[in-house]
């Protein structure tokens, strides 16, 4: 799909090209109970009051998400006009904008339009510039057009005909909007990779498959890839990671991807993604109902791979390292048992009270490994706890950090990227729940504050650098009839890196 940018100040009569240019449809926003303004006012004038008459008749009341097509409109070059309700102007925020653009894309994708002129990016949204609106609109469109059909015997062809979108933006934002197009396409491509990896079944997306995916990313985008096998992992003394992997016939992999966009001496940001390609719970076996969704337990790994791919496509001036410990968590005659004690790469001993709390066991060794890069920051991403889903549901990812400045950056990025996160507590008092009579610490701390104690466990391995943890158990995928990976938190992570790179 092709996206292009044209500067236009509708209030200064600069819209002639939009009014006369050939297009299958021009998209206009209508506020509830407000006089027309901007693009809608100009089109109304060119069509001799058609938009005003439609609004006055009540066919378009401006309620948020409502859409109405006008056909064979005279006075303009477009063959259709799509009116989109924006809701009340004083309540028009980022969510309202996203609702409006999503409604517009859904209406357009149900038609046979090929080329569209899109004016909604110029709407005033929480003091955001129109380049922000362009990026959000492209991501919303790519979200609507994403389909996972790779595993079907006859992959379904695209059901829409849309090929080209021309965005009108404020002239002062034209240059930035062109950058926003590049960023949005790269982000969408990274999210699609993340979704594809999550949606693949566990018998296809194995640890070896993830390793091969990392190698392909490296080859396609000029990155350096290291994929360590069992013997190399053993040599690193990653006893905690290996305690999870030991009962599976699928060999574990330890993936390291290096992106160098800045000077070699510049400290990298390290992203660590949990890569459990299928989680049965091990000896602490999960219930059978819904276990198929445990193929999504590698979505942390998928999001890290999708993010570094997006960073490479954007060409950000920053160094990034992606680390993915990946294996299956299976029962078996040689599986780790509740009560077993294992030794982590850091040397701390861990009493494994529950083998279904395995994500933290593979992440802790990866977090220790990250020390060798002397990182500017480390962010781990994991579908870690059901407790986080209970606490936050499916809207906000859980954010934990021992560094207020880093947490603030990530929260700012989450708002900018429309990828919500909520900071959770990490007080020292919660650490007491991880005490063990027999080892340095236990891998669970009981039912109370389960997401917090999981983050507390990880914090024991992150003392030498600024660190944050994203628990995406509620946001990485949707269940039920809408089952599928979401691609989150690629937008949040990518925006954080864009901000760090000053781009």
From Swiss-Prot:
Cofactor(s) listed: Mn(2+)
Keywords: Aminopeptidase, Cytoplasm, Hydrolase, Manganese, Metal-binding, Protease
GO BP: any one term: proteolysis
Enzyme Commission identifier(s): 3.4.11.1, 3.4.11.10
Residues bound to Mn(2+) 1: 279, 356, 358
Xref: SUPFAM superfamilies: Macro domain-like, Zn-dependent exopeptidases
Chemical reaction(s) catalysed: Release of an N-terminal amino acid, Xaa-|-Yaa-, in which Xaa is preferably Leu, but may be other amino acids including Pro although not Arg or Lys, and Yaa may be Pro. Amino acid amides and methyl esters are also readily hydrolyzed, but rates on arylamides are exceedingly low; Release of an N-terminal amino acid, preferentially leucine, but not glutamic or aspartic acids
Segments traversing the membrane: none
InterPro entries the UniProt entry points to: Leucine_aapep/pepB (IPR011356), Macro_dom-like (IPR043472), Peptidase_M17_C (IPR000819), Peptidase_M17_leu_NH2_pept (IPR023042), Peptidase_M17_N (IPR008283)
Primary location recorded for the protein, binned into one broad class: cytoplasm
Binding site for Mn(2+) 2: 274, 279, 297, 358
Pfam family, one: Peptidase_M17
Single GO MF descriptor: metalloaminopeptidase activity
Tagged with keyword Protease: yes
Active site positions, chain numbering: 286, 360
Free-text function comment from the UniProt entry: Presumably involved in the processing and regular turnover of intracellular proteins. Catalyzes the removal of unsubstituted N-terminal amino acids from various peptides.
NCBIfam families: PRK00913.1-2 (NF002073), PRK00913.1-4 (NF002074), PRK00913.2-4 (NF002077), PRK00913.3-5 (NF002083)
Recorded family membership: Belongs to the peptidase M17 family.
Protein name (database record): Probable cytosol aminopeptidase
Species, as recorded: Burkholderia cenocepacia (strain ATCC BAA-245 / DSM 16553 / LMG 16656 / NCTC 13227 / J2315 / CF5610) (Burkholderia cepacia (strain J2315))
Gene giving rise to this polypeptide: pepA
């Amino acid at each position: 799909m092709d996206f292009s940018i044209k500067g236009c100040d509708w209030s200064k009569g600069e819209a002639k090209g939009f009014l006369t240019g050939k297009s299958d449809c021009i998209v206009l926003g209508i506020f509830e109970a407000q006089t027309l303004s901007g693009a809608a006012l100009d089109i109304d004038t060119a069509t001799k009051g058609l938009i005003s008459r439609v609004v006055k008749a009540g066919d378009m009341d401006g309620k948020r998400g409502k859409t109405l097509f006008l056909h064979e409109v005279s006075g303009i070059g477009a063959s259709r006009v799509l009116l989109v309700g924006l809701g009340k102007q004083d309540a028009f925020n980022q969510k309202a904008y996203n609702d409006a653009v999503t409604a517009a894309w859904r209406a357009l994708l149900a038609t046979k339009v090929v080329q569209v002129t899109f004016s909604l990016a110029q709407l005033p949204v929480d003091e955001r510039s129109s380049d922000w609106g362009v990026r959000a609109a492209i991501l919303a469109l790519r979200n609507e057009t994403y389909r996972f059909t790779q595993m079907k015997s006859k992959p379904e062809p695209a059901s829409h005909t849309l090929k080209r979108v021309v965005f009108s933006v404020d002239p002062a934002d034209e240059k930035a909007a062109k950058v926003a197009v590049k960023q949005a396409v790269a982000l969408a491509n990274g999210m699609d990779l993340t979704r594809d990896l999550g949606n693949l079944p566990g018998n296809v997306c194995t640890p070896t498959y993830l390793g091969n995916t990392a190698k392909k990313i490296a080859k396609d985008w000029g990155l350096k890839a290291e994929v360590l096998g069992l013997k190399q992992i053993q040599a690193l003394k990653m006893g905690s990671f290996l305690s999870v992997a030991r009962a599976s016939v699928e060999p574990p992999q330890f993936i390291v991807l290096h992106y160098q966009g800045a000077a070699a001496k510049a400290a990298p940001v390290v992203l660590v993604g949990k890569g459990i390609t299928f989680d049965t719970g091990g000896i602490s076996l999960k219930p059978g109902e819904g276990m198929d969704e445990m193929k999504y337990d590698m979505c942390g790994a998928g999001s890290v791979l999708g993010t570094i791919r997006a960073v490479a496509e954007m060409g950000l001036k920053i160094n990034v390292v992606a680390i993915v410990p990946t294996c299956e968590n299976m029962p078996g005659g040689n599986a780790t048992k509740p009560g077993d004690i294992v030794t982590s790469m850091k040397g701390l001993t861990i009493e494994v009270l529950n083998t279904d709390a395995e994500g933290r066991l593979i992440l802790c060794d990866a977090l220790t490994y990250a020390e060798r890069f002397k990182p500017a920051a480390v962010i781990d991403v994991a579908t870690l706890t059901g407790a986080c889903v209970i606490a936050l549901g499916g809207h906000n990812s859980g954010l934990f950090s021992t560094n207020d400045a880093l947490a603030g950056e990530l929260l700012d990025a989450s708002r900018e990227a429309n990828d919500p996160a909520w900071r959770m507590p990490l007080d020292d008092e919660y650490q007491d729940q991880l005490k063990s009579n027999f080892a340095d610490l236990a891998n669970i701390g009981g039912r109370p504050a389960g997401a917090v104690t999981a983050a507390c466990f990880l914090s024991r391995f992150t003392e030498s650098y600024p660190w944050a943890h994203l628990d995406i158990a509620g946001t990485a995928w949707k269940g039920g009839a809408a089952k599928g990976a979401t691609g989150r938190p690629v937008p949040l992570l990518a925006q954080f890196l864009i901000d760090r790179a000053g781009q």
